[in-house]
Amino acid sequence: MIVPLSVLEFRDRAAAYFGGRIGVIDGERSLTYREYAERTHRLASALRGLGVQPHDRVSFITYNTHQLLEAYYGVLEAGAVLNPINIRLTADDIGYILDHSGSKAVFYHADFAPLVERIAPSLTAHPAFVVMEGEPQGPATHEYEGLLAAGSPDEPPAELDENAVAELFYTSGTTGRPKGVALTHRTLYLHALQAALALRISDTDSILHVVPLFHVNGWGAPHWMTLVGGQHVMLRRFDPAALLALVERHRITHLLGVPTVFNAVLASPALEQHDLSSLRYVIVGGAPSSPALIRALEERLHVTAVVGYGLSETSPVLTIALPRQHLLTTEPPERRLERQATTGWAIPGVRVRVVTGEGRDVRPDGEQLGEIIVRSNVVMEGYYRDPEATAAAIRDGWFHTGDMATIDDEGYITIKDRAKDVIISGGENISSVEIENALYAHPAVFECAVVAAPDDTWGEVPVAVAVLKPGAAATADELIAHCRERLASFKIPKRIEFRDQLPKGGTGKILKSELREPFWRGYEKRVH
């Protein structure tokens, strides 16, 4: 028997077997899984009432809220495609995403009303606008709770093709403009099963959603935690003290976040004021980590702390650096911490190789460098409306990550460098080309290049090296102010240096590796 794969099965299972359990907590609001499921049914019905058809895109601009978690199932039940948008992007980028995706409906939190009002007039499409937690204003003609109240909880779901796109996540890349990563129903279903198995979760577990749900599928948590009937607790804005209080109050078992989040937690004066004994696992991802951070998390939080690795294009989880029992009994504790700070080993259902430029596997000695390539059902369908980028990324049946790494004799992978010119700062992907384009818009700039430099707080930050036009003058502060008018705050270069010329190869291409090297001198890895 062949049954189409759909994550809607996870919601239905949770409602059937854990219906009376509190499944979602958002501030002072709690929803049982039965209530949560009903709200997703009503959302699907309401979307149809707005004219949303199967395969239409529905965008959300909001924090980690119960409404966004409801969209992970309600939008899919309507047969539409969920497109959560990074709220840290500029109005220009968000407008581009809404147009490129052809969004039929846009849901936004009331806090973002000024942003949406600014964007709406310039959109080529004319989506329906729905405001959440506020009165209809600006382009919004509907309010979320009123829309749900008018929806039916009893309409049959749309017929779903497991190979149809279910979710769309726009990720920054080397092109400057965000690319839409298209994930199918089948991909999401299998990723949830594989991640749940790898993360060893059950219905006794609970997760605090620290990772924004617009980021790489919320690391898959909306699906794999619902699958097992675990509990979702929403964190709308990151604050270390608030995070610690929620862990104690709701007996959180799993925390996922980027290194900067956990560095802030460890530095918080509130750390010693809370009972964190419920915590079992801390998964660090989104940017490279270090043994020192893993050690600090284990010693101060009394948890198993490990690194996870993945990309938007892979749903996202590919590897987890969980310890293996036979190594625990044969290796010293220090070596265990080193392994848990690596990129890890492949989760079930994922094939990972590290290959040379000729496509041969590197030696499993932890020394020879190669590119990570992946073959799995968790890999994206492709980049939305971008066949050229898709063909460049998926070649000969393998997805090419652009991440350079080594692999040891136990299969543990360690990322050493990046082939792509993407800077990962605090878990955010930053395109060096986008920053360069902003700098080139300044009349004094002749040439420039942006590279990643190590930073103790953010892991990496963008720094720029510029050559001014003959006779022109500009200070670093002036160029930074110029960028501030054109870029999201986290994309602004933290430093600008001036040179007489930039190093170039035989074809005239700027050699960013030479520019990057002085910043990383003394570091073992070229990611931080």
Q: For each predicted feature, which ranges?
A:
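Conserved AMP-binding/adenylate-forming core of the ANL superfamily
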Residues: V3, G20-T65, L69-Y73, T90-G95, ...
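Structural core segment of the AMP-binding/adenylate-forming
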Residues: F10, S45, G49-L50, E77-A149, ...
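Conserved pre-ATP/AMP-binding loop-to-beta segment of ANL
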Residues: G19, V131, P136, G151-Y170, ...
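Conserved structural elements of the adenylate-forming
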Residues: A37-L43, A149-P153, E167, V181-S202, ...
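AMP-binding/adenylate-forming catalytic core of the ANL superfamily
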Residues: L89, V106-Y108, L255, S376, ...
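Conserved AMP-binding/adenylation subdomain of ANL enzymes
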Residues: Y189-S206, F214-H254, S268
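Gly/Ser/Thr-rich phosphate-binding loop
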Residues: L227, I252-G257, L266-E338, R351, ...
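Conserved beta-loop-beta connector loops within the AMP-binding
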Residues: W345-I373, I407-E410, A472-A476, L511
